[in-house]
């Protein structure tokens, strides 16, 4: 039919084919190579071999402590991560609407999904020990503080579900350090904080739940010395003077407050201490705020709590000194220094597990972007790694209230931690023992392709890596030998 058509329009066949070829060549030459997405990384054979080796060793360490593997979907309903996750994490989700109509996100972490899976399948009250590993995804804008971090990385971690005692806290801390030891990562330390101590201290000031959660959510800001900025936020949300009600009725002031709330929302700050705002506008929030300001917390108590929290978040150092300094701050604030005992118990339990006290620091200003932690929290470092990049190798904590946040009608004691596996591998440095031991069998040396295939098969049957080295653009034997042994 093609020939008939060409005859009808009286155009030489070769001319038509040449024109089509030239057009296609021109069209395809305009294509740009498709590059990786920003802050996404490829992993080649040597990197994967080193990562797999680390995973195998860590699974062995965890397995010897009774932990079993579990997997969860990479894709989950977005609501799983929004509930009690805090503004920081929710603003970093890779979320979209899937064809079935569900709002879904690539997982940014494992904990919530592992807990959901465990609770749904639990048959008795015994402790459940789970380990996991896999990719997680967290978006960061280039202008953000961590905007240059890889947006996909591998987490490997463990969850201990059931025990509520500080003994379990000690187990998790000790195991996190054992993992680093098995990878021969030297000069490691653990930095421990305690959200539970902070929460218990705040109870003494007779504050509303909103006020306490607000203060806890701003620990990181207070640690940096940002007391004034926290006071400004507090005034915006009605935690300070009663005159705020009148201020809201003044058009100019109302406009300014709306702008502040809009900025706070865009920064992802409201999530940790408020309910999900859903489709409500800034105007809706301001209107609701004006109705609630008459129920505001006592400003003097709020300021005293803020002063205490500002002081205790500055405490950071070796465990014994930090505990004593925290007791002093509590006493000076008119609080019972025994409040600190729950943190001291965690340190003692870690020592029972074999962690030297010299390896433990306490930082009461340690904060988390994921706000479901309710007790001890910790980060783990290699001192050498920390001095270069100021990034943790991993961390975790206790999150006894997460089950209720996920929609269950009870709290369930749970704790865990996760490594950034890519950071662990980077901390190890290049693997000098990962050179290929593949035998490349040359058909020229064997006399024929069939003979080379047969010899390669015999080598593989003996448990050796072997491949036939076919000719490829005139590759020389010397280039082959650089990759492995040539036969």
Which sequence ranges carry the predicted segments?
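TRNA-binding/sensing appendages of the translation machinery
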Residues: 2-16, 20-112, 151, 165, ...
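Positively charged, Gly/Ser-enriched RNA/tRNA-binding surfaces
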Residues: 28-29, 47-65, 76-79, 111-186, ...
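RNA-interacting cores
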Residues: 32, 192-193, 197, 216-217, ...
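Short secondary-structure boundary/hinge segments and terminal tails
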Residues: 79-80, 198, 220, 477
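Acidic, His- and aromatic-enriched active-site or binding-groove loops in soluble protein domains
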Residues: 92-101, 206-236, 382-386
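Electropositive, surface-exposed helix/loop patches at the edges of structured domains
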Residues: 102-123, 223-239
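Cap/lid and interdomain-hinge subdomains that line or gate substrate/regulatory clefts
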Residues: 164, 191, 201, 222, ...
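Charged, amphipathic alpha-helical linkers/stalks
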Residues: 199-207
């Amino acid at each position: 039919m093609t020939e008939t058509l060409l005859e009808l329009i009286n155009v030489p066949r070769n001319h038509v084919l040449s024109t089509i070829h030239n057009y296609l060549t021109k069209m395809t030459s305009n294509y740009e190579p498709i590059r990786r997405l920003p802050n996404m990384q490829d992993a080649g054979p040597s990197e994967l071999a080193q990562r797999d080796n680390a995973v195998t060793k860590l699974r062995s360490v965890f397995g010897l402590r009774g932990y079993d593997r579990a997997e969860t979907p990479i894709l989950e309903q977005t609501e799983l991560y929004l509930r009690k996750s805090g503004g920081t994490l929710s603003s970093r989700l890779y979320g979209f609407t899937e064809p079935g109509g569900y709002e879904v996100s690539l997982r940014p972490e494992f904990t919530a999904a592992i807990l959901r899976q465990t609770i749904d399948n639990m048959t008795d009250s015994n402790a459940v020990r789970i380990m996991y590993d896999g990719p997680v995804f967290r978006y960061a804008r280039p202008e953000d503080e961590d905007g240059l971090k890889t947006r996909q990385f591998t987490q490997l971690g463990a969850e201990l579900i059931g025990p509520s005692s500080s003994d379990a806290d000690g187990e998790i801390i000790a195991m996190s350090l054992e993992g680093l030891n098995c990878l021969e990562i030297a000069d490691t330390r653990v930095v421990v904080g305690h959200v539970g101590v902070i929460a218990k201290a705040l109870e003494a000031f007779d504050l509303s739940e909103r006020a306490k959660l607000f203060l806890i959510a701003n620990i990181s800001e207070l640690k940096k010395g940002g007391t004034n900025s926290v006071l400004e936020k507090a005034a915006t949300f009605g935690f300070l003077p009663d005159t705020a009600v009148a201020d809201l009725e003044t058009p100019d002031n109302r406009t300014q407050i709306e702008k502040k709330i809009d900025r706070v929302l865009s920064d992802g700050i409201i999530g940790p201490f408020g309910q999900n705002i859903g489709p409500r506008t800034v105007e809706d929030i301001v209107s609701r705020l004006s109705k609630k300001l008459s129920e505001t917390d006592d400003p003097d108590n709020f300021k005293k709590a803020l002063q205490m929290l500002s002081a205790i978040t500055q405490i950071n150092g070796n465990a014994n000194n930090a505990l004593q300094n925290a007791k002093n701050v509590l006493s000076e604030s008119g609080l019972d220094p025994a409040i600190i005992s729950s943190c001291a118990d965690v340190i003692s339990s870690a020592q029972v597990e074999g962690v030297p006290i010299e390896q433990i620091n306490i930082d009461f200003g340690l904060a988390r972007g994921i706000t479901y932690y309710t007790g001890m929290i910790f980060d783990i470092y290699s001192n050498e790694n920390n001095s270069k990049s100021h990034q943790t190798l991993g961390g975790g904590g206790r999150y006894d209230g997460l089950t209720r946040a996920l929609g269950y009608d009870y709290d369930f004691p749970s704790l865990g931690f996760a490594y950034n596996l890519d950071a662990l591998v980077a901390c190890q440095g290049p693997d000098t023992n990962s050179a290929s031991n593949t035998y490349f069998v040359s058909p020229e040396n064997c006399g024929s392709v069939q003979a080379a295939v047969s010899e390669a098969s015999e080598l593989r049957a003996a448990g050796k890596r072997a491949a036939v080295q076919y000719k490829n653009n005139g590759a020389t034997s010397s280039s082959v030998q650089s990759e492995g042994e040539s036969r």
